[in-house]
């Protein structure tokens, strides 16, 4: 049989890379920043790293729930925008964010009210429990923006605009390293200064992403979408 070469559509390949590369780059940066922050946390002893691990395990439940909504947003928003149904696409985004709000009411309340219950699930070490309890109580103030940020990533991806939120997320996340160094040496709060840095950067990034959403930066201009649909 004759051999044939694949016929690449470079136009669509470019669109795929434009949507996917920012997200891939962000994942790499997040890993590198955590590698840089880990020695700072470890300077407070093994119990500090253990407490962070407990916090991340519980937060992963919130992340998993919001990731499901985020993936649904990507499909439904892209479908509706492609069909020229902008109002339906925006309604989908707003509905997903409202569900995220209800989900995170539970996590914010439980992180603040019963952090000791979460900590006791994983360890009986009193020092690790104390550090984990501080983590949950401090991070609770930004938990809604943590979940909403996951939803907003999906909303922007559905609108083929992954670059704006990725830039915000990468910059805010990268700032954690110098801010952790500064907070540890100037705030005299010990390990809590690192947890506070995590909270502040999540809050700032979430507020900026929300502002971009309400400014309709999550999709291409309507006239451009109409041309693509035509």
Named regions from a protein language model:
Residues 175-184:
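Transmembrane alpha-helical segments of integral membrane proteins
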Residues 47-48, 162-163, 190-191:
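Membrane-helix interface segments
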Residues 5-36, 61, 65, 69, ...:
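Hydrophobic faces of transmembrane alpha-helices in multi-pass small-molecule transporters and flippases
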Residues 23, 27, 35, 39, ...:
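Transmembrane alpha-helix boundary and packing residues in multipass membrane permease domains
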Residues 1-21, 77-142, 184-230:
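Short alpha-helical transmembrane segments in multi-pass integral membrane proteins
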Residues 67-70, 139-158, 164-176, 193-210:
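Short runs within selected transmembrane alpha-helices of multi-pass transporters and secretion channels
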Residues 38, 51-115, 146-168:
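Small-residue-rich hydrophobic transmembrane alpha-helices
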Residues 28-61, 79-80, 117-126, 186-187:
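Helix-terminus/linker motif at the lipid-water interface of multi-pass membrane proteins
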